């Protein structure tokens, strides 16, 4: 598995965990948990996008060889 794909998957998992935490924080009115979920969701989104860029770069380099 390429680094880019692995990072995309890790990002999606982290983003999903963040969404769940944010939702639970919303329902339970736990601001700290809600904010923690938002932060995890943001980190996951960034990881996912970085993984996509890495994958495109890797694919581009593979095509040149």
UniProtKB/Swiss-Prot annotation:
Task: Give me the ranges of the annotated region Disordered.
Answer: 1-28
| Listed Basic and acidic residues bias regions | 12-28
InterPro entries in UniProt: CsbD, UPF0337_stress_rsp, YjbJ_sf
Pfam families assigned: CsbD
| Transmembrane regions listed in the UniProt entry | none
Q: What cystine pairs are annotated?
A: none
Q: What family does the Swiss-Prot or TrEMBL record give for this protein?
A: Belongs to the UPF0337 (CsbD) family.
- Identification of the protein by name: UPF0337 protein BCE_1081
Tell me which species this is from. Answer: Bacillus cereus (strain ATCC 10987 / NRS 248)
